[in-house]
């Protein structure tokens, strides 16, 4: 069984390190990008099983990256968890309409992010024959 591929996209190096720390005991291939443009290129190149995406970034923000992903045949169904310091119903509604699976307010607890990632990865693997859940 191959390890799940996860892409972390955030302009804050500190936040990328926090995501990396959250996954320290989670067996996966973790890729990183510093903005939406880098993130889109990394997603196209690596075909991640899940993307942890920051909402507000320079160059290309999370919503623009998400819209571009939804127009790409290979990425349009890739699950996304959006991270943001913004606690706005308008933002949450916007990204939900774009298919974001979950929305986490920064700063986040490692266990919260990891439980959401584990749930999404396990749901994605369920249709595959006899794939054991990741822990």
What are these regions (language model features)?
Residues 101:
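Short, glycine/charged-rich "phosphate-handling" switch motifs in NTP-dependent
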Residues 13-31, 98:
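Two-component/phosphorelay signaling modules centered on CheY-like receiver
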Residues 46-52:
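Active-site beta3 strand of CheY-like receiver
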Residues 57:
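Receiver (REC) domain active-site loop signature in two-component systems and cognate sites
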